[in-house]
């Protein structure tokens, strides 16, 4: 991984741990250039991408597809139920096969954390791996689009007060963001049920009372309650969660006028956030979705640049 002549070069993108501040800023600025229509890009040769999603997805899956098409890539959509996965073939053997067929980039989402390790460490798999989310592990492309959205608003990260609120333990978005936001100089707070907080997060910020810190925040980043990753009896009722931990209309009045509201979506309206706030003037939730296409264009361009530089 490196930055040359202002362009990032990546072999793979699996975790925010693997990215430097320079690479992150390079990707954000390149995504902004794509958004502004000021980025020149042309493929040198036919390039194939395949999107392998083993967990449901709307935003990540479709924005990667659109990004790939905008860059001129040939996209092979992958249906796990119609593939040899349904016959017992492993993910490794599936990617090995796609690589042998000539696929250049595999975008993968899996419920298995760190699934990508055996793929990127294989001597026989040469296609680039882009992690579209691995269980409760990492979600680097979501983190980068979140960072782009924050940077568009404030033009900096240093000194910003940011709260990440909700289902922290089960959220790959939270883990990717806390890791990089701290590195970029933001001051982080974590709020939500104590049962969904881990002491390992103390390395990045502080567990806080939401009502006390709301007036100080520049960014309030809400997280979806991930019922599908909970043990039985671990979840709250929708009404109870919204009352005690959600961004209600009354709590939103405590935010500074310049503060922004974010959520990686899908949104559980009237659970994490009041329905009326999802598309409110302070919300950047729709902007995050739009930025996902441009961020993923920048990621794919960096992957292609990395392959070319080999």
Curated annotation (Swiss-Prot):
The protein's assembly and partners: Heterododecamer (2C3:3R2) of six catalytic PyrB chains organized as two trimers (C3), and six regulatory PyrI chains organized as three dimers (R2).
Listed under GO cellular component are: cytosol
Supply the alphabetized keyword list: Pyrimidine biosynthesis, Transferase
Q: Which HAMAP family match?
A: Asp_carb_tr
- Residues bound to carbamoyl phosphate: 59-60, 109, 139, 142, 265-266
Q: Which GO terms describe its biological process?
A: 'de novo' pyrimidine nucleobase biosynthetic process; 'de novo' UMP biosynthetic process; amino acid metabolic process
Its EC number is 2.1.3.2
Binding annotation for L-aspartate: 87, 172, 224
Q: Which gene encodes it?
A: pyrB
Which segment of the chain is annotated as a signal peptide? none
What is the reaction catalyzed?
Answer: carbamoyl phosphate + L-aspartate = N-carbamoyl-L-aspartate + phosphate + H(+)
Pathway given in the UniProt record: Pyrimidine metabolism; UMP biosynthesis via de novo pathway; (S)-dihydroorotate from bicarbonate: step 2/3
Residue pairs linked by disulfide bridges in the UniProt entry:
none
Q: Which SUPFAM superfamilies match?
A: Aspartate/ornithine carbamoyltransferase
> By what name is this protein known?
Aspartate carbamoyltransferase catalytic subunit
Q: Name one GO molecular function term.
A: amino acid binding
Q: Which family does it belong to?
A: Belongs to the aspartate/ornithine carbamoyltransferase superfamily. ATCase family.
User: Which Pfam family, an example, fits this chain?
Assistant: OTCace
Give the protein's biological function: Catalyzes the condensation of carbamoyl phosphate and aspartate to form carbamoyl aspartate and inorganic phosphate, the committed step in the de novo pyrimidine nucleotide biosynthesis pathway.
InterPro entries linked to this entry: Asp/Orn_carbamoyltranf_P-bd, Asp/Orn_carbamoylTrfase, Asp/Orn_carbamoylTrfase_sf, Asp_carbamoyltransf, Asp_carbamoyltransf_Asp/Orn-bd
